[in-house]
Regions:
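Short amphipathic alpha-helix that is part of the acyltransferase structural core
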Residues: 38-82
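Conserved beta-strand-loop-alpha-helix junction that forms the acyl-donor binding cleft
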Residues: 163-172, 187-191
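Conserved beta-strand in the GNAT
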Residues: 99, 105-114, 132
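A short helix-loop-beta-strand connector motif used in the catalytic cores of GNAT acetyltransferases and
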Residues: 88-99, 127, 185
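Terminal signal-anchor or tail-anchor transmembrane helices
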Residues: 2-29
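Glycine-rich phosphate/pyrophosphate-binding loop shared by adenosine-nucleotide-utilizing enzymes
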Residues: 51, 104-109, 126
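Conserved GNAT acetyl-CoA-binding A-motif
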Residues: 147, 154-166
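Conserved acetyl-CoA-binding loop-helix of GNAT-fold acetyltransferases
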Residues: 133, 139-152
């Protein structure tokens, strides 16, 4: 334990500690996700094929990103202008979209949303959303690749946990990705 004598020393110590805390907070907030990651093609492999997973790029509109997303959910009718505006919003978080591309075609995509909490010492929680693999590529392990990549990014960003919602039929897949069933999701939609 350190003891300080005199008011000047205490003010200095408080200022010094406050400065350290501000610097730590700035460093934590300035963490950026990687632009690209290499992920093993299969979970159990040590060496071998690696898949490049990268952040979404503006050009992905022309590579069929919205069509890929439509294989998962209602993607809506998004024009180039809407795409560019939404893409610009995602550049600095708190959500980050990653894709797998092969020969100019998007094979898989997923989103990591970062939530700053009061819990866990103002910790960071990652939410995995919108996991989709192109119908023609299913069964090749691309789902595992994209989930693995998003999980790594969440850990690198300092998340204390990463969570996701899935259907009952997809639960076995996410268990292969080392997720465990916990609690129940509730939803209230305001429009289709």
């Amino acid at each position: 334990m350190v003891y300080f004598q005199g008011g000047g020393s205490i003010r200095f110590a408080v200022g010094f500690v406050a400065g350290l805390l501000l610097r730590e907070t700035a460093q934590r907030k300035s963490k950026k996700p990687p632009r690209t990651l290499l992920v093993p093609a299969r979970r159990d492999q040590k060496d071998g094929e690696m898949i490049l997973v990268r952040q979404l790029e503006a050009e992905d509109f022309d590579k069929g990103f919205m069509e890929l997303l439509a294989q998962l959910t209602s993607a809506g009718n998004v024009n180039r202008e809407q795409w560019q505006a939404r893409f610009a919003e995602t550049r600095h978080g708190p959500e980050f979209v990653f894709v797998v591309e092969e020969n100019g075609r998007l094979l898989a995509s997923g989103t990591l949303v970062l939530e700053r909490k009061f819990a866990r010492g103002c910790g960071l929680c990652g939410h995995i959303e919108d996991i989709v693999v192109d119908k023609q590529c299913r069964g090749r392990g691309m789902g595992l690749v994209i989930v693995t990549a998003l999980t790594r990014v969440a850990e690198r960003m300092g998340c204390y946990k990463v969570i996701l919602d899935c259907s009952e039929e997809n639960q076995p897949f996410y268990e292969k990705c080392e997720f465990k069933r916990k609690e129940v999701q509730m939803a209230r939609y305001f429009r289709d």
